[in-house]
């Protein structure tokens, strides 16, 4: 990833509009900022949330609070706790949380 054309700036996430996204179970609440081609989101999941699809887009994800269970399409599962991150490239292992 190469980031260009993004001047220095601060993001006050408490002022970014929150949108709701329903999963197979539970809800995800996204706060999204777009910087050129780069999308940055702060996401809150309700307990028991599970995405309604497998994702093949690349992500860098950092768990700030609670636990997040991540499932790969090949059956592997991972539990993230505060301070743990994952990173995956576009079109690599399909995943869902």
Question: Which residues fall in each region the model found?
Answer:
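A short, sequence-level motif marking secondary-structure junctions
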Residues: 14-16, 46-48, 82-87
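Short, conserved beta-strand element in jelly-roll/cupin
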Residues: 45, 54-70
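Short, Lys/Arg-rich amphipathic alpha-helical interaction segments
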Residues: 96-97
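A short, N-terminal "cap"/entry segment at the start of jelly-roll beta-barrel domains
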Residues: 1-41
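Short acidic-glycine-tyrosine-enriched beta hairpin
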Residues: 74-91
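Conserved short histidine dyad/triad with adjacent acidic residue
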Residues: 36-56, 89-91
